[in-house]
Amino acid sequence: MAERKQLQPNFIPVSLADFVISSLCNSRPTVDSTNAMAYELLDVTTSQWHDEVIRDLSLDKLSWPSICSQGEIVGQLQFGDRMVPCYTAVGDYQCALAGALLDESELSLNISTGSQVSRITEQIQSGQYQTRPFFDGKFANTISHLPAGRSLNVLVDLVTEIPRSLGMPEFDAWEYLAKAAEQADRSGLRVNLGFFPGPRGNQGAISEIRERNLSVGTLFRGAFENMAENYSECAGLIWPDRSWKSIVFSGGLARKLKTLRTIIQEQFSTPYRLCALEEDTLLGLMALALAFSKRTASVEEAMKALRTHYADRLRTISNT
């Protein structure tokens, strides 16, 4: 739009969530640094807009929203005779990491439709990964868009095509596939889940097929092994000395497939734990609410309090 001279001066580029808050509170739109990252115009080193890049893109005539401090009240919503304080929207990725109750000695594996490998650091550490602002002035290093549920569904659709085309009764294919993968031995079958563009390429494959090593079980075991290899390689990029104490699994697929967790654990030779709750993002919002309402001094302190509260659900599972 800028190249075509279609941008009107002083327009405010704003996320949907921040627009809603601004409209409800009748206040000027603002943005949190964790959300500003999505604009791809944030200087992560200063948590301010990257003015030089904005000028180079001819976007300097726009009125950019102020980047607020963590937990800053940006408006008041009238609810009956009460005024409810409202805060800037935060990044869902960072909120989910907070809800995983991740500490700096743990490696996060979020596995759902797509997947991410992440860690939290005190300082910026550049490398072959994304660095995003986190809470309390910290940073999150991550490699995202790794093959997971979306790629596995390609294989699920393949092995269920015949019963579906014959109109046979629906069944829980995942339950059968997980059990078959668990019972399958290592067969040498190789699966590359890179069916879609991403950090691990965009040309998937099934290879090393022999007369007796191709079955539903070996196919999905090979797929899970490929995921584990991807995570291990990416973990080495964001954490070169591999000094993490344990893995934290979050996301629907990681919770659902114990066989996948076991194969990943074998690849890493590292203990693991699950996120305390299925809804990790909502738990992250609880941590933020504790910090923003001054019930705790920081988001980190709120996460520690929740770790204590949910201690019985954070049991670490060691290698067997």
Task: Say what each PLM segment does.
Residues 30-36:
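Nucleotide/phosphate-binding loop and acidic/charged catalytic motifs
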Residues 54-57, 64:
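Gly/Ser-rich catalytic/binding loops embedded in alpha/beta enzyme cores
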Residues 68-73:
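Gly/charged, well-structured mid-domain segments that form the phosphate/adenylate-handling core
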Residues 2-16, 21-29, 40-43, 47-48, ...:
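Active-site core segments that coordinate phosphate-bearing ligands/cofactors
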Residues 62-64, 244:
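Core-facing hydrophobic residues within beta-strands of well-ordered domains
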